[in-house]
């Protein structure tokens, strides 16, 4: 892969969609669609991802995850306000994770990509992943396609696509941002929702829960999913999480649900448990 590098002054430490590293400006391949968010220190995970994508000869790039030392500067690019006080609802690690996803949405727009596939670095890929990561099978009005098999949903209004898969409208909340596609239309839509606002909710809760309330938000699930997180496949020996300690630290700061919200949430939980079906991985 060809990487263009030019020297720049230090005050341009971080720009979108290019990344300043050791005095150099790293230009991402404008034709690349597959990006894996990963801390530079997570060499075990990076080795796993290189092997996983290599099995199917799938091209990809690592996106160096936003770290706590640059989250303030990165947030300013989008006029996002952060709470890093003792009462913060997100840890610095969770903020960096969310900003990493947001920067990639912006990268898609800046590089005029018609879509971008975003992954986290603990996934396993399923069959026909290479073909299914060429996103030419969803309608033009779709914002987000979830690729990951995670949780239950209602399988209604199926649309048959390639490799014996279907896509279904997502109508109930999901968790996890380990594998999903954002279209150009979706990148613009998501950025408009997060710019000029506080960031106090984890990125997966935004994309696969909070934004579902907007009637014009078009999001679909690929089923069977083509990726799954390591802890789902290997619950007894998963990759160690770099975010869990921070999550535990801010857990007590989360907003308490009202009685009405608790009733509504419980009703939804029972409904999905009784009538929902697990998204399969293949």
UniProtKB/Swiss-Prot annotation:
Keyword line: Glycosyltransferase, Transferase
Superkingdom of origin organism: Bacteria
Chloroplast in keyword set: no
Origin species: Haemophilus influenzae (strain ATCC 51907 / DSM 11121 / KW20 / Rd)
Keyword Hydrolase part of the UniProt annotation: no
Family of this protein: Belongs to the glycosyltransferase 25 family.
Any GO MF annotation of the entry: glycosyltransferase activity
E.C. number(s) listed in UniProt: 2.-.-.-
Catalytic EC class: transferase
Pfam families according to UniProt: Glyco_transf_25
Record's protein name: Putative glycosyltransferase HI_0765
